[in-house]
Amino acid sequence: MAPPGGKINRPRTELKKKLFKRRRVLSRDRRRKRQVVGAVIDEGLTTKHHLKKRASSARANITLSGKKRRKLLQQIRLAQKEKAAMEVEAPSKSTRTSQPQPKQQKKIKAPQDVAMEDLEDKS
């Protein structure tokens, strides 16, 4: 009776080599597809479990601990505050520039022809 893996000293056939290669390539492609792409914004908030869960289902909810939840809410509040501050600054600049301002033009004097007198001849 032969062992379950086949004969011991027999080399692999071409078909078996191709099948092994196919399985290896397919598994590599699957790993690439399931890999989460994107930079981790905040290492304190995102853990490897979150990334794993994102890979399996992008729509799944992620449970956060109280500390991480507070930190995330604080980040959102600060972002909204900055956005509101930027919106307030933008209209103030536009109102000032909307009114036409008179341009001050420099007066350029036309060069006048001046007759140069020879000082040597007079003396």
UniProtKB/Swiss-Prot annotation:
This is Uncharacterized protein C11orf98 homolog. Coiled coil: none annotated. PANTHER family: CHROMOSOME 11 OPEN READING FRAME 98 (PTHR14554:SF1), GENE, 49416-RELATED (PTHR14554). InterPro entries: C11orf98 (IPR037691). Residues 1-33, 82-123 are annotated as: Disordered. Disulfide bonds: none annotated. Residues 18-33 have a biased composition (Basic residues).
